[in-house]
Amino acid sequence: MERSTNMSGRRRDHKNRILRNGESQRKDGRYAFKYVDTNGQVQFVYSWKLEKTDKLPAGKRDDISLREKEKMIQRDLLDGIVPHGGEMTVLQLVTKYVLQKTGVRHNTEAGYKTVINIITKESFGQQRIDKVKPSDARAWLIKLQKDGRSYSSIHSIRGVVRPAFQMAVDDDLIRKNPFEFQLATVIVNDSVTREAITRKQERAFLEFVKNDKHFAKYYEGIYILFKTGLRISEFVGLTIQDIDLQNRTINVNHQLQRTRTMEYIIEDTKTNAGTRILPMTDDVYECFKRILENRAKPKLEPMIGGKTGFLYLDKNGRPMVAMHWEKYFQHICQKYNRIYRVQMPKVTPHVCRHTYCSNMAKSGMNPKTLQYLMGHSDIGVTLNTYTHLSFEDAETELKRVANGE
């Protein structure tokens, strides 16, 4: 199998070049390098070329030379990198990463399962992790978008895969993370920004709801969403005990979610900053007062996670959840746009939150105060994500400052 030694005892290849320790040449001309990996196992690598400058034999598949491979192996051995990425595939790596993420919220857990299901169906998921290069990672994300996945969906997928590969780097399974690049430089951001609506549109929307025979019963709830900036999960989680009419405050310390299996659960607020006490304006106070006065007492108060007395119940006596309100908003917009020539843009509970934040910013509210009211852990979110200020807003503010107002 191996090239024999010469008179001096030095092993040579068929071109009479001296072979180093561990190197050999097979009878078919292919070179081999034998070494012991970090696990104490004997391994072999092969190449048709000894040096980078060697000519590739006719009909053979191109590959880097044996000595180039040796350099990479020696470097990995020196740095304690596990050979071949521990023979782990992308799917196995992501699964291992997800299994270590214990105690996460149910929405996060559902997101992890979705990512694993996607990777399971992709050939990329069967690739060995040490074989994945940045160009492979980019190509896969581009493929996902061509397959019809949205930017936000791909952003979520990468949000799981990238830290999984970082775990592999930290575990010395691979040397570099192939997903360390900006997503926007690879695929087109086709996501639609959820814009705040104007004050005029807000007034028209609320007026329409108030005067509509069917939707009027939701007016107070919708008004509160527009005037408090509450997350819809926080709003539907409010109970009678959370509404302090005497001190005119709203105690926000949890949220209500319904899982895909229709299980109702109480969770902590989205962030620590989400736990807050909000003051009521006079009109918000009146809305809460009417909600409590008009709330029909059910035969049996539902209890979710130790909480009872939810403000809005559905026809089955269960607490209303985000989906109920999203449907109400959808139907309101559809009916409005069937009646009026000037169309109302898409309004959702989250648009109410955007609109509240934008209106407060335009009114000159202190950013730290606004951050508290919104329940943002990072003021950058308050300033960059939720405030949609136009040129006209900037012009008005500049004139106000210039006039010393």
Where are these regions (language model features)?
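Short, Arg/Lys-rich segments that mark the N-terminal edge of DNA/RNA- and chromatin-recognition modules
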Residues: 1-51, 254
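Short, basic (Lys/Arg/His-rich) helix/loop patches that form interaction surfaces
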Residues: 20, 147, 151, 207-218, ...
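N-terminal DNA-binding module of tyrosine recombinases/phage integrases
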Residues: 26-31, 37-135, 293-307
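N-terminal core-binding DNA-recognition domain of tyrosine site-specific recombinases/integrases
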Residues: 55-62, 86, 98-173, 191, ...
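Basic, Lys/Arg- and aromatic-enriched nucleic-acid-binding interface segment
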Residues: 155-157, 170, 174-176, 180-238, ...
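Conserved tyrosine-mediated DNA breakage-rejoining catalytic core shared by Y-recombinases
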Residues: 184, 238-296, 303
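Catalytic-site neighborhood detector that most strongly recognizes the C-terminal catalytic loop/helix
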Residues: 188, 196, 255-256, 374-399
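DNA/chromatin major-groove-contacting recognition/catalytic segments
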Residues: 261-266, 363, 384, 388-405
